[in-house]
A protein has these predicted regions:
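Sec-dependent N-terminal signal peptides
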Residues: 3-13
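Lipid interaction determinants
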Residues: 13-130
Length: 130
C-alpha cells in the first residue's frame, strides 16, 4: 500500500505543468495598432535586445510572473515622426511593464492599468539554447 501511494505521489508530481519562460526566445509585437515591426529577444544572461526604428538593448529581471526592464539604450537612427512616436511609446511601455503571461508561442506584457504588449515567437527566430 505504501508503494502504491508513493508511486501515485511521484506520478502526480511529474505531471506538474512546465513553467514557460521567454528566456532564449525572440518575439515580434503583434498589437494591431502598431504600424511597424518591433522585435524583442531575451538572452539567458539577463540582457534583452530588439529592433524598432532603432536597435535597442538593456537588462531585464524576471521573478515569478513579474518582469522589469532597465537601462534601455538604442541607436540614434531617425525616421518619420509617427514611427518615432510609436517607438518612444513602446520604450515607455517596456519601462512600465509589471507582469507577464505566456501561452504557447505568445508573450503578453501588462503595463500601467490597462496596457498590453502582445508578442508572438518570431518564426525565423534564431532562438538561443538554454
Amino acid at each position: 500500500m505504501k508503494y502504491l501511494f508513493l508511486s501515485l505521489f511521484v506520478l502526480l508530481s511529474s505531471c506538474k505543468e512546465k513553467s514557460l519562460s521567454p528566456i532564449g526566445q525572440e518575439y515580434v509585437l503583434v498589437n494591431k495598432e502598431v504600424p511597424m515591426e518591433i522585435t524583442l529577444g531575451f538572452n539567458p544572461d539577463g540582457r534583452f535586445y530588439g529592433k524598432a526604428v532603432n536597435d535597442y538593448w538593456g537588462l531585464y529581471h524576471i521573478h515569478d510572473n513579474v518582469i522589469s526592464f532597465s537601462g534601455i539604450t538604442s541607436t540614434m537612427k531617425a525616421d518619420i515622426l509617427p514611427r518615432m512616436r510609436v517607438e518612444r511609446k513602446y520604450f515607455d511601455s517596456l519601462t512600465n511593464g509589471h507582469t507577464f503571461e505566456m501561452k504557447e508561442d505568445h508573450l503578453k506584457i501588462f503595463f500601467d492599468e490597462t496596457g498590453i504588449l502582445e508578442f508572438k515567437i518570431k518564426k525565423e527566430s534564431n532562438t538561443i539554447p538554454l
